[in-house]
């Protein structure tokens, strides 16, 4: 068999022409030390701060410490296969996460990867987890209400869209319950043209607790407009630290596209603890309470991203409800004072109130909303205007009344009314009230219609009142809802209706 030279050269030329494989160039370093979720690598000379890197077993990490001769990398995951000599390469991208409506109804980890066994996420858009907060010019002052469905809050500590309102209190005082109720109450907004989408970020919590929250949201039909980001207690500290920024990026998608979002960080105390752990292992100098010097900045740059945008920028909003856990009611500790100074007000929950049966255990005297007043619905403002003062006078007189039994008629009347108002502010969990229902309840309390009811029966009387209002006077409720205010005519009709219902209740 003879093979011609021309044939061979033709085959070779063809193969050379078709050979077009490009060599993949990547900057690779080598791990020189690893331990406690931190790896130090040598050779990644051009790595950026906050850049994602990948170890040879596929585990991801983030470059945090850029030193002269090595790079400190926090590891996302177990990292059991990472040892001295393991190669690590740059990815060239800063941490980014999936965003969009495809995340609604889903549960993700601290990096936005799904962990709910419902398949891949139906979203293509990604955003950087860490971005600069909007400047002063694109913002607008808070002026639209965000109803929580909780009488004590909407009446006394109103929250507006785009506000940052801190929920602070000891463990087991109902902080998460307030946040979950607020998420459940946003279901009403989905019947209007400006729905509020919700993100719940669980930081350092037990998996069983997160599962319980997801189940509660599903049972109340709230998962349809909610995304849960969970970095649980068993996740590495870097994941717990990053999860808040991941959730925030998801919320910013709605804010920047002219929609409204609510984000709950539960809780930032555990995020600060995770950051302290990372910083100490990275040998950063410790400051007060062993937290690093920039612990204020990690919370301020996160919470400043909650904003109400002006109309030229779409008019969207991102409202933040950060949660802080105190030790024995000490709000003057480092992290609580930091977050109080960053936020636009705080809801203070007290253990004593909780155990005395006043739930939600909101301390009316210590809770404030610095910007929410301008977002409050006029009807609520009209009926709840005197409520804070009435309660303050009641608390003062109640303390005074312990010392003596001889009280004048005015004081006795004040104590009598105050007791009923305290009872009126009680509310069952997962039972948020609409704005018009709250107006009716508070109106009945502050205008003295409930003075004839025994203090123990106030909660029952209120339930009956709302039930009868829906059954017989739904037109009045509709008027309050549509107009958003109480005119003289509506007030008179409401007074007559409430008097009749209470009379029937007492009969």
From Swiss-Prot:
GO terms for molecular function: ADP binding; ATP binding; proton-transporting ATP synthase activity, rotational mechanism. ATP binds at residues 169-176. It is a peripheral membrane protein. It comes from the Bacteria. It is an enzyme of class 7 (translocase). It holds the Pfam family ATP-synt_ab. F-type ATPases have 2 components, CF(1) - the catalytic core - and CF(0) - the membrane proton channel. CF(1) has five subunits: alpha(3), beta(3), gamma(1), delta(1), epsilon(1). CF(0) has three main subunits: a(1), b(2) and c(9-12). The alpha and beta chains form an alternating ring which encloses part of the gamma chain. CF(1) is attached to CF(0) by a central stalk formed by the gamma and epsilon chains, while a peripheral stalk is formed by the delta and b chains. NCBIfam families: atpA, PRK13343.1. This is ATP synthase subunit alpha. It comes from Magnetococcus marinus (strain ATCC BAA-1437 / JCM 17883 / MC-1). The gene is atpA.
């Amino acid at each position: 068999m003879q093979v011609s030279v021309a044939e061979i050269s033709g085959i070779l030329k063809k193969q050379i022409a078709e050979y077009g494989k490009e060599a993949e160039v990547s900057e690779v370093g080598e791990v020189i030390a690893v331990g406690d979720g931190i790896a130090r690598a040598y050779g990644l000379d051009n790595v950026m701060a906050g850049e994602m890197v990948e170890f040879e077993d596929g585990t991801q990490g983030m470059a945090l410490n850029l030193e002269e001769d090595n790079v400190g990398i926090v590891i996302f995951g177990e990292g059991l296969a990472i040892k001295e000599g393991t190669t690590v390469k740059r990815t060239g991208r800063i941490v980014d996460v999936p965003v969009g409506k495809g995340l609604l109804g889903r549960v993700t980890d601290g990096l936005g990867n799904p962990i709910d066994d419902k398949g891949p996420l139906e979203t293509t858009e990604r955003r950087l987890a860490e971005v600069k907060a909007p400047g002063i010019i694109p913002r607008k002052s808070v002026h639209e209400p965000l109803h929580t469905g909780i009488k004590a809050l909407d009446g006394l500590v109103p929250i507006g869209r785009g506000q940052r309102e801190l929920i602070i209190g000891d463990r087991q005082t109902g902080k998460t319950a307030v946040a979950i109720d607020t998420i459940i109450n946003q279901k009403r907004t989905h019947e209007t043209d400006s729905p509020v989408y919700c993100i719940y970020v669980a930081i350092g919590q037990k998996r069983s607790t997160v599962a319980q929250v997801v189940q509660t949201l599903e049972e109340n039909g709230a998962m349809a407009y909610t995304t849960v980001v969970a970095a649980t207690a068993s996740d590495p500290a870097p994941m717990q630290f990053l999860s808040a920024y991941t959730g925030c990026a998801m919320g910013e998608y709605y804010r920047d596209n002219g929609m409204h979002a609510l984000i709950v960080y539960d809780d930032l105390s555990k995020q600060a603890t995770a950051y302290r752990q990372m910083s100490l292992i990275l040998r950063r100098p410790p400051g007060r309470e062993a937290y690093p010097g920039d612990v204020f900045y990690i919370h301020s740059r996160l919470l400043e991203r909650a904003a109400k945008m002006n109309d030229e920028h779409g008019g969207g909003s991102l409202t933040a409800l950060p949660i802080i856990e105190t030790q024995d009611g000490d709000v003057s500790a480092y992290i609580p004072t930091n977050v109080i100074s960053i936020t636009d007000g705080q809801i203070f929950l007290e253990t004593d109130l909780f155990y005395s049966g006043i739930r939600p255990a909101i301390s009316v005297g210590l809770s404030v909303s610095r910007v929410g007043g301008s977002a409050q619905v006029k009807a609520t403002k009209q009926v709840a205007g005197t409520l804070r003062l009435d309660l303050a006078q009641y608390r003062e007189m109640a303390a005074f009344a312990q010392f003596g039994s001889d009280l004048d008629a005015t004081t006795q009347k004040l104590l009598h009314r105050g007791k009923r108002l305290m009872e009126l502010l009680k509310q069952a969990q997962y039972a948020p009230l609409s704005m018009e229902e709250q107006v009716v309840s508070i109106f009945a309390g502050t205008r003295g219609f409930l003075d004839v009811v025994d203090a123990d029966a106030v909660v029952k009387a209120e339930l009956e009142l709302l039930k009868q209002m829906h059954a017989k006077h739904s037109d009045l409720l509709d008027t309050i809802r549509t107009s958003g205010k109480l005119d003289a005519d509506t007030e008179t009709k409401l007074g007559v209706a409430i008097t009749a219902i209470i009379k029937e209740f007492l009969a």
